[in-house]
Amino acid sequence: MRQFGALRGGRRGLLGCPAGDRGLGGVPRRPLPKGSTSPTLSIYTKNHFFYIMSFMKELELKYGCNPNQKPARVFMENGDLPITVVNGRPGYINLLDALNGWQLVKELKEATGLPAATSFKHVSPAGAAVGLPLSDTLKKIYFTDNVELTPLACAYARARGADRMSSFGDFISLSDECDEATALLIKKEVSDGVIAPGYSEKALEILKAKKNGNYCVIQIDPNYVPAELERKQVFGVTFEQGHNFLKIDEKSAFSNIVTKNKTLSEDDKRNLIISLIVLKYTQSNSVCFVKDGQAIGIGAGQQSRVHCTRLAGQKADNWWLRQSPQVLGLQFVDGIKRADRDNAIDVYIGEEYMDVLAEGKWKNIFKVKPEVFTREAKAEWIAKNTNVALGSDAFFPFGDNIDRAKKSGVTVIAQPGGSVRDDLVIEAADGYGMVMAFNGIRLFHH
């Protein structure tokens, strides 16, 4: 049988009995997840929740991308699905997020040796991170003050906290067994669901109580490997391609450094690898800023490369501004919800700050009316950010991307190269003393 967090001996053939039969030790089988084609079995022990994954060849869905797109299902042409729905009922987009997010965190864990988490929305990550300890400032802006944090919980707090506006209502992917500390963080956030290779007994109890018992919890077989060929249909036309098994590591990511400055610290290397793995599962065009083991700005799905860089840079700036004394000192009214506080901060540090500072409005949000966070003060604070890594899923065609990256503290870059203006892009990077690698790896994802 299969234990959450580990593989155990036994046979899934035990599930051939009728759904009404009693399982091992006389424990009744759980009701079938809706859409499942076979029964499942759950057993509790002192520390873990045991769950036998069902022979699930397909899963019926309520609808596809939109309510009018019926019928809908996910299925395997050959073999069983590598997932089991433990609780709730995932939707079409939930599963797209879950399966893309799982690949991302699995590869982050393999590349760094650290637990990893990602927060997905509409088939792109809003945040992704590995489990490095949090500073006191990060604990405050991630709402984890005075909370016990495991490495996996740190990874999730970072992934969720980088772009809280975009992560609202996300689908979470975890590289490791979900522990109680991580589940307690998830419990407090607005989220659609989570996928992980396992769950501790306490974590599962916490998650199953979320959303009035409807929170989506998915277990994935960590040893599942997809077929070498993958297919999808568009307008009735079938597309086929080889699965992207490209491994991103130190050798592939930045062995060809083209700038005068060629010095990369171990932190730089890890951050660049993280940025590229994130891009591998982000809708193109995409650019990713990473600092201290977490994505701090992801620009996804833009037709223009420089707009990717601007979008990711703005998100990185907002993440950094949230750590400024002026924002940390904001005094919110008692009982304000997290989402309202996140929105107020986002508006306050932006150009439309009067929307929260105007008379008749600020008293609904703040105990004390804040001073305007001026452009000059924001620029001064942003200039203090440094040691940021930048990855791009395709080449930079112009040096303006480098100029914009510099404004958000970028010091190291990994990109494919291959532009007819590579010499000008290198010249721009050299002008700032940056390290830039041409890795020849395009990471388009659609």
Language-model segments: residues:
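Glycine- and Gly-Pro-enriched alpha-helical subdomains that act as flexible
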Residues: A126-R164, I296-F395
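Flexible, glycine/charged-enriched surface loops at secondary-structure junctions
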Residues: A111-S119, V217-I220, S284-K291, L321-F332, ...
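Gly-rich Lys/Arg/Thr-decorated short loops/hinges at beta-loop-alpha junctions or inter-strand turns
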Residues: E77-R89, A162-F168, G242-K262, D340-W362, ...
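Active-site loops and adjacent core secondary-structure elements that bind or stabilize anionic groups
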Residues: T45-E250, D268-S286
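C-terminal binding/interaction regions
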Residues: L174-S175, K188-V217, Y224, N385-L390, ...
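Long, charged amphipathic helices and adjacent flexible linkers at domain junctions
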Residues: I218-L264, S324-I336, D342, V368-K369
